Amino acid sequence: MNIVILAAGTGKRMRSALPKVLHPLAGRPLLSHVIDTARTLQPSRLVVVVGHGAEQVQAAVAAPDVQFAVQAEQLGTGHAVRQALPLLDPAQPTLVLYGDVPLTRASTLQRLVDAAREGRYGILTVTLDDPTGYGRIVRDASGFVTRIVEQKDASPEELKIAEINTGIIVTPTAQLSMWLGALKNENAQGEYYLTDVVELAIEAGFEVVTSQPDEEWETLGVNSKAQLAELERIHQRNVADALLVDGVTLADPARIDVRGTLRCGRDVSIDVNCVFEGNVTLADNVTIGANCVIRNASVGAGTRIDAFTHIDGAALGANTVIGPYARLRPGAQLADEAHVGNFVEVKNAVIGHGSKANHLTYIGDADIGARVNIGAGTITCNYDGANKFRTVIEDDVFVGSDTQLVAPVRVGRGVTIAAGTTIWKDVAEGVLALNEKTQTAKSGYVRPVKKKS
């Protein structure tokens, strides 16, 4: 089977410099969703017709199995499909999809393809409570499709028809070339419409069959930011419903965004307004607090992530406790039972089993052993303005509050670092490290006061 995806439109109503089909839905271009669905049908040829912003669109979705045809002038859907003809296998049927209709299920398309076997012409239709603005499917007394009539050309009786054309079709490819060549542009837009092909197919004696989707929203397209937002919420609710079926507890299924792949174990609980991006895995008994953003991360069993935590490119072991207001950046690796608390940032660092950094700390480019306590206000000074250096803290170290560790530096096992200490040399095992200071108390001191006006 050939699949052609039309993606050449300008998208004027989007009011954006970005080509319409590249606007994101769930964090990925609209067109990428359509291509992924098309791939599940295992086409022999997959052709995307580009036009407006052609180079940008091609760069965004380029892949070995995707070919591109260019529609230099936007002269209608029929003209667009015609540009793809040289890339198609004439012995195979062709399914035509749209790059701005991202939610059509593969099962819906497969039913249409099955209905159109043996050289039939297939149309995906949908029945609407309010079909205003759409082309109507006109049938004869026996129920056979005779034509598609546009709203402006429909008679009062035809306007009562609730079954409408979605534009998605399956057609014999060998005949399609002839039918497209016979199209006329005698309409208000001066364009060649793919919908006109159905009458040519009927005149040529081809049986026209129809199929319908399970859900009306499968055929909704995007022509404005409002429609894009509507489809985003539909998609996210579908994702949420699937998570609920899998046993995930969602505090509010309407307030979760998954912009990638989210895999959850048993008894996972997710509070409101959480965003998951890229590939995220949550193991059994993970609890996510409200307003968290988690991207490309794995979270071990029994972990608790408190509210307003941001995690990006991190790996968390089992029974860790994170947040609230923590930030784990790429390369952060936490062993089992590690704690990273409020206003702590971890970047490209390993935190060992049972170690804790509970308050107001920056840990960057560091290797921290097991059972280490990092006091509030501790900073690993990892950057000299040009180069990054690592800090190594071995097992069972106690780091007092307001400590600076100037990398590269190693702190040996069992060391105690007093509060307010700056470490710039390696520290041997088991010692107390401190910067000796003198505390002075001056009697008779009078604090300055503001003069009253």
Curated annotation (Swiss-Prot):
Subcellular localization, as worded in the UniProt entry: Cytoplasm
Record's catalysed reaction(s): alpha-D-glucosamine 1-phosphate + acetyl-CoA = N-acetyl-alpha-D-glucosamine 1-phosphate + CoA + H(+); N-acetyl-alpha-D-glucosamine 1-phosphate + UTP + H(+) = UDP-N-acetyl-alpha-D-glucosamine + diphosphate
Keyword Nucleotidyltransferase applies: yes
Positions of the catalytic residues: H359
Pathway(s) served: Nucleotide-sugar biosynthesis; UDP-N-acetyl-alpha-D-glucosamine biosynthesis; N-acetyl-alpha-D-glucosamine 1-phosphate from alpha-D-glucosamine 6-phosphate (route II): step 2/2; Nucleotide-sugar biosynthesis; UDP-N-acetyl-alpha-D-glucosamine biosynthesis; UDP-N-acetyl-alpha-D-glucosamine from N-acetyl-alpha-D-glucosamine 1-phosphate: step 1/1; Bacterial outer membrane biogenesis; LPS lipid A biosynthesis
InterPro entries recorded: Bifunctional_GlmU (IPR005882), GlmU-like (IPR050065), GlmU_C_LbH (IPR038009), Hexapep (IPR001451), Hexapep_transf_CS (IPR018357), MobA-like_NTP_Trfase (IPR025877), Nucleotide-diphossugar_trans (IPR029044), Trimer_LpxA-like_sf (IPR011004)
Residues at which UDP-N-acetyl-alpha-D-glucosamine binds: 6-9, 20, 71, 76-77, 98-100, 135, 150, 165, 223, 329, 347, 362, 373
Main subcellular localisation: cytoplasm
Main enzyme class: transferase
Region (Pyrophosphorylase) location: 1-225
Keywords for this protein: Acyltransferase, Cell shape, Cell wall biogenesis/degradation, Cytoplasm, Magnesium, Metal-binding, Multifunctional enzyme, Nucleotidyltransferase, Peptidoglycan synthesis, Repeat, Transferase
Co-factor note (free text): Binds 1 Mg(2+) ion per subunit.
Intrachain disulfide bonds: none
Subunit and partners: Homotrimer.
Family per record: In the N-terminal section; belongs to the N-acetylglucosamine-1-phosphate uridyltransferase family.
Protein name per the record: Bifunctional protein GlmU
Source organism per UniProt: Burkholderia cenocepacia (strain ATCC BAA-245 / DSM 16553 / LMG 16656 / NCTC 13227 / J2315 / CF5610) (Burkholderia cepacia (strain J2315))
